[in-house]
Amino acid sequence: MKALSCLLAVIATAGSLFQHVDARSHARDRLNNISRVERPVIHTPSHRVHAHSHFDLTFDLYPRSSRIKLQLEPNHDVLSHDARVAFLDGEGNVDRMERIERRDHRVFKGWAWVQRKSGSWERVGWARVMMQRDGEDPLFEGVFTVMHDHHQIIPKTKYVHKRHPHDPPLDATPGEYMLLFRGSDIRTQTHDTVERSITSSPSCDADTLAYGTQSDFMFPPLPQENNTNLWGSLMTSIGRRQNSDTVGTVPGSQNLRDTIGNTDGCPNTRRVALIGVVADCTYTSTFASEMDAKTDIISVVNAASVVYEHTFNISLTLGEVNILPKNCPATASSATPFNQMCGERVGDESFTLADRLNTFSAWRGKKSDDFAFWTLMTDCTTENQVGLAWAAQLCVKGVQGDSNTRNASSQAVSGANVVSKTDNTWQVFAHEAGHIFGAVHDCDSALCQDPSNPDNSRCCPSTATTCDAGGKFMMNPTSGSQITAFSPCSVGQICSRMAKHSILTNCLTTNRGVDTISGQQCGNGIVEDGEDCDCGGDESCKGNKCCDPKTCKYTSGSQCDDANEECCRDCKFASSSTICRLSSGPCDPEEKCTGNSGDCPRDTHSKNGETCGTNLQCASGQCTSRDLQCQMHLGSQVAGSRTVAFDSYGCQVACKDPYRPDVRYEGSLTFLDGTPCGGGGTCENGQCTGSTFGNEVSDWVSRHKPIVIGVAVGVGCLLLLAILSCICGRSKKRRPRNRKMAPINMRPMPPVYNGWTGPPPNAESPGGHPQYNHVPPPINAPPPAYPGRMPSTRYA
């Protein structure tokens, strides 16, 4: 039984490692149109700008004859105060480490305006820009929106490098200049095929990777016989950007409609997510220098962060950048196994984007930082995949699984993703980060019509009654037009995950006490030493009566800032009876303001394992059980309210219908952290931790009572028979024999076995002794001396 217990423990542990889903992004489709950026003007006296400049930037779009104005200010959030760049050698060792100086990077944010025929200007969207060259002939890149249609500005060299085979050709104009394309210029997608070639638009294919028998982390669970394996993997990508390009724990599909547009759970005040980025050799090789690669990464994060700031009140901020040399090694170093040439052969197979994620995740798992996640930037693709991510791994440190094998059922899972370089890299970056935050794909016509997608459970629907989201949002499976924001369904999904603590948020810091690269910079949205408040500059501070945007001090009579402090009401501290964080149940008590501070006290939960109801225990702030989580996540596909957990051992959600006890239903979900699991342990990020061998044996016994009882009864019966046999044997030994004893002075005649003289007699004749032929002893034999009575002898 010890061996069996060990085997079951190994199986269950292995099964708990691979309940994650990864998602992939695919390259965009061809462009129908492309424009030249003409007559760019920096509106400063000398047409010069520095890292802390506030200015307007205007230009024309040819041949559309539109005049655009970008009203810009520094984006100090994009780099942390101690942001650093590590330049690695070919073996993956740090060659040198440098601090990223904020003054060296002219990174801006702001708003986009369009000039009307009347000459007036109308604000039409947001803008993010990285200035490469100022003066009278400026060069810049970035993205801005016009009525939710994103406009991408890229240098000619980048367009040429990533030009789609069917994109419009360029003229012979020499030198570097700027081009622009809109999301609406990308060819409209059809959904008559699932697999797309490199000429297809970028998509996310996490759904195409095996996760048990599923093809997407949100696919409905398939019934499995009890003897099937307990693990698998599901990976997805962004071009049909993501049928699936995420890997991780994902909430039950039946809840997506219930939370559409619900922002409960998302932060009410600004939070900062520090991230790390690595550029592999293929990515670095596309730039003239390693410094240019670093600059491009900053530009990508600058653009991607805006959708998180506007939607979730979370800034994506660079904490560390690692740059690998542009010359790819002949053989990847063990320190950086992900750093390989595109299409490199590993055995009989190519090194795919999934392999890069797997090996990069193992690398990230060894990092000891508190970053929200790490991203690997590469120039490689697998078919038309341009991105891949583990789902719902925000703030997760360490690694689960094994990266030493390329078997899809054995993977390394951590807070990591992979993004390929495209001409809209920022969008791929934002999409893959969405999966890290736990978002699934928006529904498109293909997913809505897929017979394996009952009740549209694999994706985020447009509304509670409409499936197809129309390809308008950030988590659309393919790149397309007007993709600049998250859908209401994605917003509700991510916020509800935060509210239910099904993703970690402990790495998201407030905007107070976050050192920025700019030091004491009023207007960067971060409250630093010496500042009372910082509402983010003149534009962001409009209507704020508590904070002076010029001095970052409270206005006269103000004690706090309503915009950034949860216990502030009309610029005064809220009373101690004010609830600043509502209770979500018996395991998550409400928090109240202190009355002498603008900050809400730390969110606290009841201890995991604490009883909160009949057969219910606290786990991650929720009053729940394994059965209840099964009903919540898989009930609609199994047996509704009578759905129960398949067993009490692992941390992957596996359920059953009590009337079909031998059929196992499982998906890509994991039980909440703190949920009890085998051996007296608790689930933590999909793994059963804290179990002991003794408890595992006890747990195994309790889970197999019929077998144990049967074996115990059988063994007990055998023992009873053995005892009875012994008792009977001893009783016969003590039974008196009706046998004549030899006289005390006479030597008994020893028997001599000469064989049977006739038919073999019975061993004992009735009322007498066995009959033998005897030979008399020698006549002169001296008699032996007997010490006493001879014991009886039994012959058989």
From Swiss-Prot:
Q: Which GO terms describe its molecular function?
A: metal ion binding; metalloendopeptidase activity
Carbohydrate attachment residues: N33, N226, N313, N407
UniProt record, GO biological process = proteolysis
What the entry lists under PROSITE patterns is as follows: ADAM_MEPRO, DISINTEGRIN_2
Task: Give the cofactor note text.
Answer: Binds 1 zinc ion per subunit.
Which Pfam families does this chain map to?
Disintegrin, Reprolysin_5
UniProt-listed InterPro entries: ADAM_Cys-rich (IPR006586), Disintegrin_dom (IPR001762), Disintegrin_dom_sf (IPR036436), MetalloPept_cat_dom_sf (IPR024079), Peptidase_M12B (IPR001590), ZnMc_ADAM_fungal (IPR034028)
Q: Which residues bind Zn(2+)?
A: H431, H435, H441
Q: List the disulfide bonds.
A: C395-C495, C448-C459, C580-C600
**Region spans: Disordered:** 737-796
Q: Which cofactor does it need?
A: Zn(2+)
Q: Which residues form the Peptidase M12B domain?
A: 271-510
Superkingdom classification of source: Eukaryota
Q: Which residues cross the membrane?
A: 707-727
The protein's Enzyme Commission number: 3.4.24.-
Tell me the first and last residues of the signal peptide: 1-23
Task: Output the CDD domains linked to this UniProt entry.
Answer: ZnMc_ADAM_fungal
Query: What keywords sit in the KW lines?
Result: Disulfide bond, Glycoprotein, Hydrolase, Membrane, Metal-binding, Metalloprotease, Protease, Signal, Transmembrane, Transmembrane helix, Zinc
List, for all copies, the residue spans of the domain called Disintegrin. Answer: 519-608
Where found in the cell?
A: Membrane
- Membrane-topology descriptor: Single-pass type I membrane protein
Topological domains annotated Cytoplasmic:
728-796
Its biological purpose: Probable zinc protease.
Quote the protein name from its UniProt record.
Disintegrin and metalloproteinase domain-containing protein B
Provide the species name.
Answer: Arthroderma otae (strain ATCC MYA-4605 / CBS 113480)
Mind giving the lineage of the organism this protein is from? Eukaryota, Fungi, Dikarya, Ascomycota, Pezizomycotina
